[in-house]
Amino acid sequence: MKLDIVLIMFVTFSTTLAQHDEREEWYPFRFGNGHVGCSNRLGMSENDFCRKLCNQDGKWRNSKCKEHYCYCGPQRFYRVIKL
């Protein structure tokens, strides 16, 4: 009986976590009045550059580059700074 409950909970949570990225809302990264593109002159890949832009305020966010524009997800975790 306990094993059945644990199994049901495991399947429910793993399914929820697996589908989480699909339901996540993505927001375009904006600077001024424009939408920021992923291309850069720093020699970084588009995904790395987009990640750097989305996380510049010290908060963990998912990021993605879609159609050469940068999109940021909602805040995940605060960064922990080790001294």
UniProtKB/Swiss-Prot annotation:
It is found in: Secreted. Expressed by the venom gland. Contains 3 disulfide bonds. The keyword Secreted applies. Residues 1-18 form the signal peptide. GO terms for cellular component: extracellular region. GO terms for molecular function: potassium channel regulator activity; toxin activity. Keywords: Disulfide bond, Ion channel impairing toxin, Neurotoxin, Potassium channel impairing toxin, Secreted, Signal, Toxin, Voltage-gated potassium channel impairing toxin. Reversibly inhibits potassium channels. This is Putative potassium channel toxin Ts20. It comes from Tityus serrulatus.
